[in-house]
Swiss-Prot record:
Expressed in the cochlea and in the organ of Corti, as well as in the supporting cells, including pillar and Dieters' cells (at protein level). PROSITE patterns: ELMO. This is ELMO domain-containing protein 3. The keyword Cytoplasm applies. Acts as a GTPase-activating protein (GAP) for ARL2 with low specific activity. It is found in: Cell projection, Stereocilium; Cell projection, Kinocilium; Cytoplasm, Cytoskeleton. Keywords: Cell projection, Cilium, Cytoplasm, Cytoskeleton, GTPase activation.
Length: 356
């Protein structure tokens, strides 16, 4: 191939808008360089096989850079951006670098430090009773919550008014931790996607299933998976939820149990134990975990199916104080294999006092 024909082919490519003319960017010293002239007809993919790259980098004496066009600068900037592109959470693409787990206390601290005043206005701390119901509750009902614990109770109810914000890093870490702990995955996942349906949400966006419970439902799931004892319990219940006959939506069931816990708190069923322990959040968490375990035990032993879910939840929610007897359950009730001693909980002491 002659030099003229080669130059014609190169300039034709440039006219198509791909690159500029090479001849316009070469210095006279390069045009006179015999070694380079010999390789003009070699495809770019073959340069590495002929030592061209070494020639271009080693023979720099007398070389003066030509004028760089605006198109060349723009192409260079676009190329440099390639290595700095990061996945967008909303696009559903997950990062290959897994994020750190977030503990329950760290997530709770987030809500203790942000301004929740707009959400707090919506809460109703206790059930408003009138007439005979108010009199009966006053005479025979549980004690009132100590005044020093009312702020902590209000925080729990306020968190239940907060929705899931996928743009909030803390909210995202909570979701990622729940997913990875339940599935055993080592990598983060998209915050929206069909994989959430596998865990028992109704759709691809977990936020749509949190009505009536808000972010408290996710905090309860986080509490369940971040403790070594309750994590094993959660994984057993998750396996039960995937049973070919007794299957049920795991996360959606958890949300409903959070709703029962909120109702128990507002009805002051947990006040006695909260007063005794001088804490509210740990008592609510224990009540949630014990109720979930009780539901799973009922589900397995009574051979319930998804058609029974409404009845089972109604039975649990009719009188939360009846759950005082669910203590001392273990995953042995979910698994025929003997459960380790550390998997046995004593929730009964907490709730037997709550109904007296």
């Amino acid at each position: 191939m002659s030099e003229t024909s080669c130059s014609f082919l190169i300039e034709k490519e440039f006219q198509d808008g791909q690159v500029e003319s090479v001849s316009a960017g070469l210095s006279p010293s390069y045009k006179d360089n015999g070694a380079l002239m010999a390789f003009r007809g070699i495809p770019i993919s073959e340069l590495k096989n002929h030592g061209i790259l070494q020639v271009l980098t080693a023979e720099t004496n007398g070389w003066q850079p030509g004028v760089v066009s605006a198109e060349m600068l723009r192409a260079q900037e676009e190329w440099e951006v390639v290595d700095t592109i990061h996945p967008d959470i909303e696009s559903g693409v997950s990062s290959q670098q897994p994020g750190q787990f977030i503990s329950f206390n760290e997530a709770l601290e987030h809500f203790q430090t942000v301004d929740l005043s707009s959400f707090k206005k919506r809460i109703q701390p206790t059930i408003q009773r009138t007439g005979l119901a108010a009199l009966r509750h006053c005479l025979f009902g549980p004690p009132k919550l100590h005044q020093g614990l009312q702020e902590e109770r209000d925080l729990v109810l306020t968190i239940a008014q907060c929705g899931l914000d996928s743009q909030n890093p803390t909210h995202g870490r909570v979701l990622q931790t729940i997913y990875k702990k339940l599935t055993g995955s080592k990598f983060d996942c998209a915050l929206h996607g069909d994989h959430w349906e596998d865990l028992g949400f109704q759709g691809a966006n977990p936020a749509t299933d949190l009505r009536g419970t808000g972010f408290l439902a996710l905090l309860h799931l986080l509490y369940l998976v971040m403790d070594s004892k309750t994590l094993l319990m959660a994984q057993e219940i998750l396996r039960l939820s995937h049973h070919h006959i007794q299957q049920f939506p795991f996360c959606l069931m958890s949300v409903n149990i959070t709703r029962i816990a909120i109702q128990a708190l507002r009805e002051e069923c947990l006040s006695r134990e909260c007063n005794r322990r001088r804490k509210v959040i740990p008592v609510v968490n224990s009540f949630y975990a014990a109720t979930f375990l009780h539901l799973a035990r009922m589900w397995r032993t009574q051979h319930n199916t998804i058609l029974d879910s409404g009845f089972v939840l109604k039975e649990l929610g009719i009188e939360p104080r009846a759950l005082r007897s669910i203590g001392k359950r273990s995953t042995a009730e979910l698994n025929p294999q003997p459960a380790p001693a550390f998997l046995v909980w004593d929730y009964s002491r907490a709730f037997m006092h709550g109904s007296r």
